Amino acid sequence: MSAKSFEVTDPVNSSLKGFALANPSITLVPEEKILFRKTDSDKIALISGGGSGHEPTHAGFIGKGMLSGAVVGEIFASPSTKQILNAIRLVNENASGVLLIVKNYTGDVLHFGLSAERARALGINCRVAVIGDDVAVGREKGGMVGRRALAGTVLVHKIVGAFAEEYSSKYGLDGTAKVAKIINDNLVTIGSSLDHCKVPGRKFESELNEKQMELGMGIHNEPGVKVLDPIPSTEDLISKYMLPKLLDPNDKDRAFVKFDEDDEVVLLVNNLGGVSNFVISSITSKTTDFLKENYNITPVQTIAGTLMTSFNGNGFSITLLNATKATKALQSDFEEIKSVLDLLNAFTNAPGWPIADFEKTSAPSVNDDLLHNEVTAKAVGTYDFDKFAEWMKSGAEQVIKSEPHITELDNQVGDGDCGYTLVAGVKGITENLDKLSKDSLSQAVAQISDFIEGSMGGTSGGLYSILLSGFSHGLIQVCKSKDEPVTKEIVAKSLGIALDTLYKYTKARKGSSTMIDALEPFVKEFTASKDFNKAVKAAEEGAKSTATFEAKFGRASYVGDSSQVEDPGAVGLCEFLKGVQSAL
C-alpha cells in the first residue's frame, strides 16, 4: 500500500464540520463531537458512536428511521462518558427514552455503559444494546469478550431505527432493545484485507508483505484469524475462506447463526474504505454466485456499498442476516411485524444509507442547558481530606516510579501504553486535589472518577472510572447520614458495591489476567479483615498469579501466548496500593 495520503490538521473536527455542512438537517456540537437530529417526543431515540475512522458509521446513519444521534471520539478511541451523557441529554429532550447501540469493543462498552448508569441516575430512561457480529474471533479465542462488531451493526441501526420510528411509542425502550438483540443474534460477518489501513497523522506500518493478506482483520488493524500467503484469487478468498467461516454448521467455534435451506437471507457486502466501487460490485456478484452454488442460498435482498470503514482499508466484509429466523423471533413479541424486510426497507433519510430516500428537514437547535461537564453525587460521608490527599500523592508517586517496569511488561503482552496510561491517571488525581470536595467522600470519589476518565481515556480509564463511580454510589447507600464519618466498615461495604458495579460492564473475572486479578482479592480481603496491609498482600499475590494465565481480555487476548509475564494492569494497581500503604 502506498504511504501517501492527504493530511489535514485537526482531522476529526474538520471531518465532523464538513459532514454537518453537507447535511443541514443534522446539528453538530463541535466541542462535544455530538451530532443529532429532531426526535418525536413519544418515541425512543437511538444513539450510537465510537472512535472516528469508520465513516459513514456513525454520523452517516443519523436520520428519520435510523439513529437520532451519534457521539464520536478521536481516531479509533471511544468518546468519553461526558460526551456520551451530553448526547443522551440532548436527544432525550424530545424523546421518551434513549437506546445506546454500542459496538462490542471494551472501551465503547465501558464508556457507554457508565453513561447509561449516570443517565438513569438523572431519571432518564436509558438502556444499552451491545452489538457483535464478527466470526473471525471464534468462541474459543473470543471467550467472555464476545464477538467484535463489524458492518452488521449498520443493519441493526436500520432495522431498530425503523422499529423505533413506527412502534416504540407502543413497546417502549425494552421492546426496542429486544429488537436490537434479535437482529444481532441473527447476524454474522467476516472481513478480509490486503493490508493495514493508513491512519491520519501516523506513519504507515504493517507486518504483511506484498504476498500476504489477512483473513478476519478487525476495523482497527487488529489481527485476524489467519494470514494468507500467497494471496488467493478473489474467487477463492470468498468461496474457500470467507463463506465457510460464516456458514459451516460443523465449525462449532463459529457457527453463531443457523441457516436452513428455505431461510430468506440478506447479503451485505461492505467496502472497508479503499476498494473501488467497481470491484465491490464484482465481489458482490461473485459472493451471490457462490452462495447459490455452494449453499443453495439466493439472497432475498442484497446491499453493497461503503457503510463501515477503516479509513482507506484495502478490504471488504461479507454480512449475512437470517431474515426468516429474525422475522419469527420478532413476530413472537410484536404482532404488527410481518417481516424484518419491511423494517429494513422502511423510509430513512440517513445520508449514509445506500438505498435511502431523502427529505429535507430543519435542524434542531442546541439546548445549552442540557450540556454539563461537572460530575456531582449526593454528598455523604465526612473524612480527613489532608490524610486522603497524602495517600493519593503517595500512591501516584509509586505508580510514576514503577512506570518503566509496567511499560516493559506491556510491551511483551499488550500495546505498550499501560504504564503511560496509569501515570496519566494518577496525575489526573494529584493535579486536581484542590478541586475535590473536602466535606464529602462520596462527592470527592465521584470527582476523581471524572478526573481519571478524562486523563486516562481508553479502556483503563473506563474501568477505573466505573469502579470509582460504583464506590461513590456505595458510600451513598451505606452512609446513614450526610455527616456520618467514613469508617473501615463503610469503606469495605462500599468497595463491594464498587466491584459489583464494575462487573456489570466487564466480563473479566479473577483468572482472566487483568487488573481484576489484583482488585478482587484486595476487595475481598479488606471486606473480610478490614486490614489494608493484608488486602495489599492479597492483591500482590493475585497480580503474580497472572503470569500463569492466558489473557482473555483487552488487546493481549488477540495476540499470542502471554504466559510467564505478569499482567501490567494488575501490577500497576498493586503499585498504587503499595504507595498508599507506605503513607498510612
Swiss-Prot record:
**Gene3D superfamilies the record matches:** 1.25.40.340, Dihydroxyacetone kinase, domain 1, Dihydroxyacetone kinase, domain 2
Look up the EC number in the record and give it.
Answer: 2.7.1.28, 2.7.1.29
Sites bearing Phosphoserine, chain numbering? 2, 5, 365, 512
GO: which molecular function terms?
ATP binding; glycerone kinase activity; triokinase activity
Chain positions recorded as ATP binding sites:
415-418, 459-460, 514-515, 567-569
Sites of N-acetylserine modification? 2
List, alphabetically, the PROSITE patterns matched: DHAK (PS51481), DHAL (PS51480)
The name on file for this protein is Dihydroxyacetone kinase 1
Q: What does UniProt list as catalytic?
A: 220
